[in-house]
Amino acid sequence: MKLVRYGRAGAERPGLVDATGRLRDLSRVVEDITPEVLTPAGLKRLRAVKADRLPAVKGKPRLGCPLAAIGKIVCIGLNYTDHAQEVSLPLPKEPTIFIKANSAISGPDDPIARPPGAVKLDYEVELALSLIHI
């Protein structure tokens, strides 16, 4: 099951991509793709839904940030040897931990604005773990 959020930025709707690759509207089932929807109970509820009975989404709408209601984003930098070598930096002896604003998350094809004064942007990020406190 591939969960997505689609639509205009700031007004995304919940959806899923079915086994045939077709985008389906999930808004009759859940209000949005939130951390609560990703709990075992929430995922069990979604697995019970028959995707072919959900409305098909027409066209190719924008895909947004995959998760709504994102809290704090804690990151670890330079934790892969290959990436450190790509950016010509040594691996740190201790993990480099930093926090990102949740506004840094975007859809896969959204433009990325370079902050004023920024000289370089790093393109690589891996999602390792999402901690949910309900």
Segments and roles (model prediction):
Residues 63-65, 85-88, 112-121, 126-127:
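A generic local secondary-structure boundary/capping motif
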Residues 56-58, 109-112:
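Short gly/ser/thr-rich secondary-structure transition/capping motifs
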Residues 78-81, 101-103, 117:
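Beta-hairpin (beta-strand-turn-beta-strand) motif
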Residues 132-134:
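Conserved small/polar residues in nucleotide/adenosyl-binding loops
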Residues 1-95:
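N-terminal non-catalytic cap/leader segment that marks the start of a structured domain
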Residues 15, 128-129:
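Active-site and channel-lining beta-strand-loop segments
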Residues 91-108, 121-123:
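Structural signature of FAD isoalloxazine-binding scaffolds in flavoprotein oxidoreductases
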Residues 1, 10-12, 107, 116, ...:
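Short beta-strand-initiation
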